[in-house]
Structure formats: structure tokens, C-alpha cells
Amino acid sequence: MIIEAVDLFYLSMPEITNEVDGSQDALLVRVSGSGLTGWGECEASPLTSIANFICPKSHGAAHPVSYSVLGQELNSPQDIVRISNEVREKSLTILQTPHTFSGIEIALWDLLGKYLEEPVYKMLGFDKTFSKTPYASQLFGTTPDETYEKAKSSLKTGYRAVKFGWGKFGIDLAEDQKHIEAAREGLGKDCKLMVDVGSVWKDDLNEASSRLDMLEKADVQWLEEPFYTDSFSAYKGLSQSTKVPLAGGEGCHNPLMAKNMIDFCGLGFIQIDSGIIGGIGSAKEVADYAVSRDVQFVNHTFTSHLAFVSSILPYCGYEDFIFCEYPVQLKPLAWDITIEHIQLNDEGKIDIPEKTGLGIEVDVEGIKPYLSMVKIELDGKDFYQTPSL
């Protein structure tokens, strides 16, 4: 099979706010060949990645991503590995490349699975999949009372684990204490509580350390992203000062970055987004490495169920990796991207679809209201315009 076309679609809510919520817009990728289509989603700034895909080359290591994808043969997983390596080599110095290619790579797996009539998890080498315990991933409330109500609601819905993140957490010590206490009170003592602070402390070990007592008393399952992704010494120092495991890695945009975090940051959990790191294959490489280093692998997902499935597939065949991030505050755009949605089973867990490819289909009619039409001109000539859905 030949990769005949790669089409990018910029989707957006009518209004984009300053809320740290990646489900407000999306860049979908459609890859076509042999009369079949595969879909993927980039965790990316859509317009930036469109430019990255079609831009003129600047030099030998700054080609557009399209240069290494269009016209390639796609008949086996090894072809995806080969294309991935070529993209990295030919578009090495364009920093947006991993974000852009991630969605394309995901779509390649979907297309190949449909072509070979196999689910992606089997092409990754797994014989079977294991259910994951979802944690209801959401933002902290604007007040401790709102955090408490969110916690109660999640518990009532049936979640055994809940993560609160971002908001204003990490700025005021006294307010942080109130939010943590509210979350724990709302969840009760048996529900797992995770906390994501979105790198709010940059690389300030003292600021992070001042919250350890409250986190330990609340029996927090993990503290996520206390620092920037590359703040290795701060991560390591904090890990040696607390019983609370640290989680991080969503900012990793290649497997080596994630492996370095595993080796040098003292992490208990490595959290990877297939839409950032280079796709499903790159995420699977990290999951395999996490097994060898006795570190828990977890997906990062705060967008659509297309992205959700893509980020669980790399570790769905590992029984000991038990958690998965399950976003519960999606904007309508993110929900409307797919026809199917992955729901909790009778045991309150998540199962991977068994169908060919990714096992989940894009709702073409459902996304049309969110489509942003893009036209790029260069030297007075049309260089790019949004393709037809």
C-alpha cells in the first residue's frame, strides 16, 4: 500500500479561553491509501503544525514533514518505524515536528490495521489487553467548595481514582491546603487521589517541598509535574524528600527524553502522550523501557477519545500498568470527534476496543461545525488550503 494523501483538519470551539484545557481545539489527521483511511490526532497548536507539514524546506534537516511521508510504502509496522526515523532525520531542526508527526503516525497505525484487518494492539506485539483503572481527570475547582463537589460527584459516578490539576493550585500555600483537604473529604479515604500542578513551581525545589506534608497527610497517590520536564535535579531532589511518588513526562517529545526522566528524575510514574512523543510506536518504546526500570507507565490524555485510545494502546498489554487518565471535562468539540466513546465497564474499569485499527471511528459529520478553513499563500500563490472532509 502507498500513502496517497495526508489531510489535516483544524477544529476549534467558537471561543478559546485561557483555561488550561487542551480540548478547546484539535488537529485531526486523515491518511489515505488503497481506498482506506486512518485517523489520528495531534496534541498540538493546529495552525503551527499545518505549517510544519507543508512549509518549504530551509535546508537538509529542515524539510516539511510531508517530505518524508507522502508516497511511502506502508505494509507492516516496520514501515512505520522507518518513516518515523526518516521524519526525525529530515525535519530534525523544526521543533514542532514531533507534535505534527505524532498524529500522522497514529493515523498510519489505524490505516495499517484496517489494511491488515488487525487491531493495533496485536501489531504492537500484545496477545491480549488488560483493563485499566481510570482516574477522573479534571481541573481544581475555583474554590475549595467546588473542588469538594467535583470530588463527591466523581465518587458517586463510580470512579475509584480522581485527579485534580492546574487551576490556581501551587500559588498560595494556605489555599492549596484547603483544596487538598476538600478533595480528600469529597472522595473519602478509599478513593485514590492524584494531584497535577502543571509545572507551577518551575524548578523551585523549596516551593514544592513546602507542600509535601499536606500531600502525605492526604495520602496522595502521586504528585504530577511539579517542575518543568527538563528540571532533572529538582525532580530527583524532591523524590528523595517524600513518600509521595512523582509523575511526569507528558512534555517528552521523543523516547529518549522519557527514558532520561525515568533514569534521572526518581519518578514512580512516567506519563506519556502519544500525540506528543512521536506517536504510538514511540510511546510503546517508553512503556517497554518502564517495564525494565520498574516504573509505572500511564497515558496522558486531556482531549478526545481518539487521543485516549491512542495513548492507552502502547501499554494495554501490560497487566501491571494499572491506571489510565480519563478526561471528564471535555469541551463539546472533543466529545464530538468520535462516533464511539470508551465507557467504564461493570467493574468501573476501561477496556480497549477489539476492532481493527484503533478500534474507534471519527464522526465526520459531527466535526464539520468545528472546522476552521485554512488557506496559506506564499509569494502570491496558494500554498495550502483545508481539504474536503
Question: What is each stretch, according to the model?
Answer:
Residues 1-39, 43-48, 329-337, 386-389:
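Structured beta-strand/loop patches that form or line metal/cofactor-binding pockets in enzymes
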Residues 3, 35, 104, 117, ...:
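Conserved, mostly hydrophobic/aromatic
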Residues 31-32, 36-115:
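Metal- or metallocofactor-binding catalytic centers and their adjacent structured scaffolds
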Residues 99-101, 105-141:
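Glycine-rich, aromatic-flanked loop segments that form ligand/cofactor-binding clefts
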Residues 130-242:
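Metal-dependent enolase-superfamily TIM-barrel catalytic cores that perform enediolate-based chemistry
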Residues 358-389:
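Extended hydrophobic packing segments that form well-structured cores
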